[in-house]
A protein has these predicted regions:
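GST-like fold's C-terminal all-alpha helical module
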Residues: 103-194, 199
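A generic structural-conservation signal
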Residues: 36, 87, 158, 199-200
């Protein structure tokens, strides 16, 4: 059976955002069963885990002898087995892949730049100086994305693909950056899919409500 790694606990602001959600959603869209390997605090830094995921992040995807990391690679791999994510027609398949890459390369870095400043470093002077510029750069990218989406329900027209899965999870990171109603409606449309709801419920159910105990001195 497919196994994915996920955290057993994260702070409340990160719940529903940790990147195993993307893989859970893809597996739900594909109708593929899976189980989770829940990591306690520090497990991601062990030599065993770093051999599987050199950066100590979640998720990893394991099936038989195959181990993958990076959500883009994992979602595209799942899509190879699910026309619900990657169409069979070569040109449509290539366009879906294009939007997966665009979400991760052209949009997410700029949204994450804002997230890091506002969530982790908001009180530091350098962050105060960079915040407005970071938000404006991200807003420019989102304006370009909204124009590319136009009035279409999904990025490639009437059909939801892996590109929409990836893009909508990226856009959820900081919702208030989405000032264009077209993007707001787009994310609402994507996340209204039953597979997303199942994936989100599964992630939230795996989190312990209590914070991990501090290690003994």
């Amino acid at each position: 059976m497919i196994t994915i790694s996920a955290f057993a606990w994260v702070p409340s602001f990160a719940r529903g955002q940790v990147r195993d959600l993307r893989v859970r959603w893809a597996l739900e869209e594909a109708g593929l069963p899976y189980r989770t390997r829940l990591l306690e605090q520090g497990d991601q830094d062990t030599a065993e885990y770093r051999e599987l995921q050199p950066f100590g992040q979640v998720p990893i995807f394991q099936e038989g002898d195959l181990t993958l990391f990076e959500t883009g690679a994992i979602v595209l791999h799942i899509g190879e087995r699910a026309e619900a994510l990657l169409p069979k027609e070569p040109a449509a398949r290539a366009r879906a892949t294009q939007w997966v890459v665009a979400a991760l390369n052209s949009i997410e870095p700029h949204i994450m730049n804002v997230a890091l400043i506002e969530v982790f470093y908001a009180d530091q002077e350098w962050a105060k100086l960079r915040r407005a510029g970071a938000r404006e750069f991200a807003a420019n990218r989102l304006r370009s994305l909204a124009n590319a989406l136009g009035d279409k329900p999904y990025l490639d027209g009437d059909r939801f693909t892996a590109g929409d899965l990836m893009m909508s999870t990226v856009l959820r990171i900081i919702p208030d950056l989405m000032t264009d109603v077209r993007l707001q409606d787009y994310v609402a449309r994507c996340t209204a899919r039953p597979a997303f709801g199942r994936a989100l419920d599964a992630q939230l159910a795996d989190f312990r409500p209590d914070a991990p105990a501090e290690p003994a001195p």
